[in-house]
Design a protein with these regions (language model features):
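Extracellular/periplasmic carbohydrate-active domains that bind, remodel
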Residues: 1-171
């Protein structure tokens, strides 16, 4: 079996993401029971390249297997060039999936996040629904998210598509 993931800190880092991938990501292969207490703090994203195929996101969680992903914190993150997606959180079935069931995503915190320049791309939070399975990511907290000097206070202001998900709170 796979080992659960807990107590991870990514701090004081500088990122440049080229094609094929996401910058600060959890996923796709989430083949454990739990991923929790992961903190991305005080990081600078200089570049996140346009990829054109489910990648190219700056702050991402792609839960394509069974894990319960929760209590994840993105804090004090500065972004200069986000070309394709800003926030991309999905529970999904993908080419990387091996588990039959999909996991849950909840209690995700975004605090002091800023796109300082460059494009202002779309954000996505999407759940999963099949015949007998519904996974609704929930509990997303946005505290002082700033785009080009303007604080955002709603999914619309964040250019966010929300499907099969709920409990988004802005302050």
């Amino acid at each position: 079996g796979c080992t659960d993931v807990r107590h991870i800190l990514v701090e004081d880092c500088l990122f440049w993401n080229a094609e094929f991938g996401n910058t600060l990501e959890i996923g796709y292969e989430t083949r454990c029971d739990e991923i929790t207490d992961v903190v991305f703090r005080n990081c600078d994203v200089v570049h996140c390249q346009y990829e054109g195929n489910q990648s190219g996101g700056v702050l991402t969680i792609h839960n394509a297997d069974r894990a319960h992903v929760h209590d994840i914190v993105y804090e004090n993150i500065r972004i200069e060039d986000a070309q394709e997606k800003f926030i991309d959180i999905k529970t999904l079935d993908s080419k990387y999936s091996r588990d039959r069931e999909r996991g849950m995503v909840n209690d995700i915190f975004f605090k002091n996040i800023e796109i300082t320049e460059g494009a202002f791309p779309v954000s996505i939070i999407r759940g999963f629904e099949m015949k007998n399975e519904v996974c609704r990511p929930h509990g997303f907290y946005f505290d002082n998210v700033v785009i080009h000097g303007e604080k955002v206070m709603s999914p619309g202001e964040l250019h966010m598509v929300v499907e099969l998900s709920d409990e988004l709170k802005f302050q």
